[in-house]
Amino acid sequence: MKKLFSLIALIGSFAFGQIKPIQIDPINNNLFVYQTFNSFNGVEYNANGMYLVTNKGIVLFDVPWQKSQYEELNDMLLEKYNLPVVAVFATHSHDDRAGDLSFYNDLNIPTYATSLTNSKLKKEGKATSKFEIELGKTYKFGNEKFVVEYFGEGHTSDNVVVWFPKYKVLNGGCLIKGADAVNLGYTGEANVVEWPKTVHKLVAKHPTIKQVI
């Protein structure tokens, strides 16, 4: 059921330690994947964030993996659409998802995370979101809608997904791994027993999914 999303090929080579540029690829005219990079145990990984373009502004789902790219992404989106980022939703507490929400809080951009994610962030001495996600609520921003849902533990105890009913697209975050994934990535906070059960619940809830990111 999971359809792999084709990302823009990386062009050229980069010196050791240099941050790879943000890669953006469309799902449709309003929904996009953006890809950032980091390494874990000497292996390079990508992180797929998403953003939704509405007539009131851009909703960001997860932050760039590198904090140095937060402002870069904001500027890219403003230049491309002439619209500001109007909200940031974090799908769990890790650096490639919630990162450092203080950047957005300081810009008075509304930030959202679940109570569990915020408790994890607070425990780690990191900035928490300004608003708490209401799971199952249909969020409306301009002409677009989406729902943030929790089906159980997997990659982390707080991993949530985002459902875009108009497009039948699911942002699975780190809960969903691509068919080409060679491993589960970081499992230090994972519940590998419950993980497949959680995914099964998700699929049962959304049998009409057209695309998973």
Model-derived segments and their meaning:
Residues 4-13:
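Sec-dependent N-terminal signal peptides
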Residues 19-22, 26-27, 57-58, 65-66, 107, 112-213, ...:
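Metallo-beta-lactamase
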Residues 26-73, 162-174:
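Conserved beta-strand hairpin/beta-sheet module of binuclear metal-dependent hydrolase folds
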Residues 30, 52, 62, 77, ...:
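Divalent metal-coordination and catalytic microenvironments
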Residues 35-44, 121-123, 180-189:
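Acidic/histidine-rich helix-loop elements
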Residues 46, 67-69, 93-99, 119-121, ...:
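Active-site environment of divalent metal-dependent phosphoester hydrolases
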Residues 55-57, 68-112, 207-210:
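Active-site metal-binding motif and surrounding structural segment of the metallo-beta-lactamase
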